[in-house]
């Protein structure tokens, strides 16, 4: 059968011509009842949703075949629009972790407002993004009341633990090795100073703020400590975020006596057969040298605002940070000076302002099926060299202290862009999802003779930051290649690009555990100068992996990848690589 005429009856809100455009079925088309049902009620931009978004909850549309003539059908679309319904009561059930106002402030469905299906779906998304409730079991129950022309909405939630603990301990050549990290995602700073009747447990909670405390040690050779605080609704009235953090770390070197001892032990081992570690003579722990060290400390303060334009998925944030590096006979930073030496003693300061424009419209923080994420940022230091009136091409050529003073205050401008998109291939909760990724970064300078040795890109491998790799570099993952292999020492990255795609499939989506498998292809590269940036000159890889999310631990997983290209003049391909993943990457 073919469609001949479509007549609309009872419509006053939308014109018949406009409704025909939205129906997308014109005269002469094959009469497709499935397509018609999707355009009337099923699709996101279905005609019914236009009515629901304007509060017409009691709207009804009945398509009637009024005439069948041969192979042609005439349709009459009979609409009962009904009155607009306002929201009467909004109830929240199942919340036993947060203060109720913390949940209510995220809702777009508030008493007195006109009912809107779009607002209902957006409220669902905002609750899921909070991370305190199982996103797979958020159930809005809409109860229309035709008598009063209102609707009640019951939000049925399932609370889940969202705090994270990371603990590891052991013994190695450097002595005691350990790490402890505590992340409290439902902290309440107000209750810390003014205890209320709702004070819960040993730690004040209920306001949805995040407090993170961590410490790490590798015996006497490395120690680091950090603390951070984040409030997504600073002041409690508007979605303006506030953050503050501080850190300190120290790493020391190994005494030259260790290498002499190691040489002698190997000598005796050769002639007398004693093991290299016989009696513990080769342990680093015995050769700690406090006169060779690098200390780092810093702090940051940030503020963010949810925007209304272009839409309210956008946020704008600013962060002011300060870092200080104290070098004491430290020969591993590879800062080459004008006098030909490498900087080993001195102080470096990094004062910068970071501005970020971001947008996140994903539907689920753990296993996104739809939506996108992107961020564009610029990090700037003051252009000290423009005001100093110094010729840095020859500055300090004959004097170490003068040459090292070039880096007392580091200067640079750093530009980054990151994006991800998510597309569900089928409907339902257990559906395959394609994730695509594109990102790049550039580290520029104000003076070509005063390029920053810090804030470079450390590319390759699993993307996890380690204390022994790069002190002030940003770690960029590229699976299929060893950690940092694309930017070895002496070839630091001042520009990078990374592209990729993943096919994900959920194996388990429960409150306590979420597991999904993935297959991926990706490519990327890093360059020692911005002028060498070439997004078509990529190192390629492909592989498979699995991710597991546990509430007390967070996201972790393992990937196997194969690198198809050679790197840094190597005669062999990168080949097979395993990568262990801890944490959720943007």
Language-model region placement:
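Gram-negative/organellar outer-membrane beta-barrel architecture
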Residues: 97, 116-367, 373, 479-480, ...
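Short acidic, glycine/proline-rich loop/turn micro-motifs
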Residues: 104, 256-257, 388-390, 529-532
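C-terminal outer-membrane beta-barrel translocator/porin domains of Gram-negative envelope proteins
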Residues: 147-149, 163-172, 328-507, 512, ...
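Active/binding-pocket-proximal capping segment
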Residues: 100, 124, 172-175, 246-247, ...
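Interaction-mediating elements
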Residues: 1-130, 134-135, 141-153, 157, ...
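C-terminal beta-signal and terminal closure region of outer-membrane beta-barrel proteins
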Residues: 464-470, 531-586
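Phosphate-interacting basic helix/loop segments used at nucleotide- and nucleic-acid interfaces
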Residues: 42-62, 136, 223, 299, ...
